[in-house]
Amino acid sequence: MKKKFAAFALCLICLLSAAGCGQAKTDTQTPPTTDQSAVTDDYLTTISGTYVELFPELSKSEYRSIWIDATTPIVGAENAEATTDLLLGMCMAEPYGPVAAEKYASDPNSMAFNCYFLGGVDKFVMDGHTITGLDAQGQEVFSHTYKLLDEENENGFIFYQSEDKGSGQFTYFAFSPDTMETTYHLEFRYAEDLSDLQSWFEGNYAYWNAAAIAENYDQATMENVIELFGTENLSNAE
């Protein structure tokens, strides 16, 4: 089963291809989807746990050698450092929404994704059908119970809606069908309006796709997620 980082794969070819973004832009109109064969009818109940932002963990200096080992066989030792920086940078951009859409329309070569948590959330706690967001001090930002929606979309995401009124930015969640067991990370988006979650490239949350990893991840998980992120996506871009 191919286990790709969905948002990253949309723009990697743009920066690695010698042909430039002119051709790659066409590819982004039909973004790759994750294999859903192992996903249950109620995905949210399969990912219980506490999650932190993925890319600040991936970019820690103690994991640099894992990156180099993963990228060297594909791009060569002389390019491994630069490629690692590129891979991380592709998902650690600050702008999103209309600001990002305007920026990347005028400068396609700078295209990247914001994969951080928004709305003042430092950690997400998934517990059955309840999603809770905690800030950096451990205080609750929100906590709601969610129901599964029957919502089809081109990205293959699984949609949930809060059962509480006035849920604001956390009214809707859209999850890529990743789990810690299959892809060693999660990808998801959230918004007040469902329409903002239908496209990676339009709306108030364009070029944003939160990426998370279990707070209690171990060394083996970090090795696996880096190998997945580096090896499969670089191979796909060749």
State the predicted function of each range.
Residues 32, 105-238:
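Calycin-type beta-barrel ligand-binding domains and close structural analogs
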Residues 16-20:
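C-terminal motif of bacterial Sec signal peptides marking the signal peptidase cleavage site
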